[in-house]
Amino acid sequence: MRRIAVMGAAGRMGKTLIEAVQQTPGAGLTAAIDRPDSSLVGADAGELAALGRIGVLLSDDLAKVADEFDVLIDFTHPSVTLKNLAFCRKHGKAMIIGTTGFSVEEKQLLAEAGKDIPIVFAANFSVGVNLSLKLLDMAARVLGDDVDIEIIEAHHRHKVDAPSGTALRMGEVVANALGRNLQEVAVYGREGQTGARDRKTIGFATVRAGDVVGDHTVLFAAEGERLEITHKASSRMTFAKGAVRAALWLDGREPALYDMQDVLELR
């Protein structure tokens, strides 16, 4: 059995991850961790996820459960994830990282850690989204510079980063396929007298509203026709199942920084 720990276990995504782990053959939740100031520390992780008692108590410190897991799943905040990364690197623990909002410099720290431990880092662990990335690469290469490209994403009102990590990853895939640098061609929102559109740019539009789990559309617009590639998530479980799938896939892998394209063999 693959022994899995979940960081941020008392949060919405954490509870969903607990459920996904418990539903997956070959996986078992052996540790659950949350903030030191959480009033839920000491509670049974299964009860937090409405699964009933499973005998795993919520801890407030990763170090306290260091001997109880093989791989840590972390969907938290960059500052938290980087601390956990240092811990896992020191103790030889594999990591699944679904945290978004990393800077370029912080992503480099993930790459450095990948020299010592196996890591799967992805902006989105949904199988559908990762298949969409493959389709976006194909579409961009075929349509080339003959289209305007816009990326529209929507998430719930509590999401703190914008654009979403998934939208940015979609932009990177499209830009790379076209030989462009996303940092140079990205346009984040438009207002006022913007002038005619530069076809080399890739636009981003963000919606934050209600309880939207995650919608992403990439629009390729030409004269007389347009192509839209859309993914809509209706449940966090799709991300959680992908993360657990990645945790099982990592078993026995050499140290490296992998992503879901590797897990799904889409390269």
Swiss-Prot record:
SUPFAM superfamilies: Glyceraldehyde-3-phosphate dehydrogenase-like, C-terminal domain, NAD(P)-binding Rossmann-fold domains. Pathway: Amino-acid biosynthesis; L-lysine biosynthesis via DAP pathway; (S)-tetrahydrodipicolinate from L-aspartate: step 4/4. It catalyses: (S)-2,3,4,5-tetrahydrodipicolinate + NAD(+) + H2O = (2S,4S)-4-hydroxy-2,3,4,5-tetrahydrodipicolinate + NADH + H(+); (S)-2,3,4,5-tetrahydrodipicolinate + NADP(+) + H2O = (2S,4S)-4-hydroxy-2,3,4,5-tetrahydrodipicolinate + NADPH + H(+). InterPro entries: DapB_C, DapB_N, DapB_N_CS, DHDPR_bac, NAD(P)-bd_dom_sf. (S)-2,3,4,5-tetrahydrodipicolinate binds at H156, G165, T166. One of its GO terms (cellular component) is cytosol. It is an enzyme of class 1 (oxidoreductase). One of its GO terms (molecular function) is NADP binding. Keywords: Amino-acid biosynthesis, Cytoplasm, Diaminopimelate biosynthesis, Lysine biosynthesis, NAD, NADP, Oxidoreductase. It holds the Pfam family DapB_C. NADP(+) binds at R35. One of its GO terms (biological process) is lysine biosynthetic process via diaminopimelate. Its main location: cytoplasm. The active site is at H155, K159. NAD(+) binds at G8, A9, A10, G11, R12, M13, D34, G98, T99, T100, A122, A123, N124, F125. The keyword NADP applies. Belongs to the DapB family. Catalyzes the conversion of 4-hydroxy-tetrahydrodipicolinate (HTPA) to tetrahydrodipicolinate. This is 4-hydroxy-tetrahydrodipicolinate reductase. It comes from Pseudomonas putida (strain GB-1). The lineage of its organism: Bacteria, Pseudomonadati, Pseudomonadota, Gammaproteobacteria, Pseudomonadales.
